[in-house]
């Protein structure tokens, strides 16, 4: 019986160590993004993170707009003179775009040009 208990205890310790190491690989990233004339500078248009990373996008703009992170379904209003945070944990892998949304007079919205593409790797 003590041998079985010891084996189960060792298995539990290995599982805890694995979970700790898996969690340790996630990181936190902050990106300051400025929209001017409807565009983000070329060198800031691609963001790469790993799955489970905590991501914070700090948005500033020269004109008010609504922005939407597709795939994560996060929408924020951004306005001149303020920094607006968009936070998420990168659970889903793939390529996700952030686009401005503009209201249509007939209802709904239309999309502007892609501001940023976020690539989430496993």
What residue ranges belong to the model's regions?
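Bacterial N-terminal signal peptides
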Residues: 10-20
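Extracellular/periplasmic metallocenter environments
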Residues: 27-33, 78-122
